[in-house]
């Protein structure tokens, strides 16, 4: 399986602008810039997109692991906070991703849920891709 996305950049780093698109067209010429990445300007940025991908992947991995254990979630809600730090030796680096998930799962206890969530975090393809960063998880039943 292969998925495709593209980016086009115009101009210099600080005053330039770019567009990000995905093959599915969910993103089509979506604007990004230095301001959206480093100055909290309106628009998207690569780290936000990484966070969205990780939250989505983890939620699906958790659903799969719950299914293997005989459980079906009514709802899984996950957010990902991506930390981008500027280190003198390495420049800008994604150093940490914190996943926060809440789930409503009939018949499961907190201990079993925590173990399954930890396994989903370790097995999620995006977690494995981003293994150079510290990945933390806060998983709660609701």
Model-identified regions with their sequence ranges:
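Extended beta-strand/beta-hairpin segments
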Residues: 1-52, 59-142
